[in-house]
Amino acid sequence: MNENGRHQGQHEVLIRKYFLSCSYGSASEIADFFASDATIYDTNHQPISSREQIGQFWIDTREQWNGATWHVDSVIESDQSAAIEWTMKGTLDGDEVIFHGSEHYTIVGGVIREIRQYWSWRRNALTSGLLGYDYPDA
């Protein structure tokens, strides 16, 4: 069960553990969630390919945002796919930053094969997400 009393599917459990690893784990712990030929596609940077590069990418990103943490806000899943909304919290130059985004997963054999990440970042803004949407405190 999740915090809303709803049963979690196997993909949701995997993704929530992956997000905990992105927030607090090592590069190798993060890499363990991915197939060897996995790729992350993103609206803000070039694709990241291979589980090792993905693991190191999240360590670098966490450091860039001074101990950033990621939080799963909602999940919908089916046979080999899942879609989530997420929140990232971190700091930049002493100011809190909060980003919101959406990801689409392909999961095969209990590991992540592909993520397509959608979010926007404007250097002069300390938050991102849907315009006019009242996000709950994640």
Language model features: what each stretch is:
Residues 33, 40, 104-106:
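Hydrophobic beta-strand positions
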Residues 2-10, 55, 59-138:
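A beta-strand edge to alpha-helix "cap/lid" segment located at domain peripheries
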Residues 39-49, 60-64:
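A short gly/proline-enriched turn/hairpin at secondary-structure junctions
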Residues 35, 42, 92:
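Acidic surface patches and DE-rich sequence motifs
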Residues 37, 44, 109-111:
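Residue-level recognition of short loop/turn positions
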Residues 1-5, 42-44, 51:
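Short, charged low-complexity linear motifs
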Residues 1-32, 36, 133-138:
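Short, low-complexity N-terminal intrinsically disordered segments enriched in polar/charged residues
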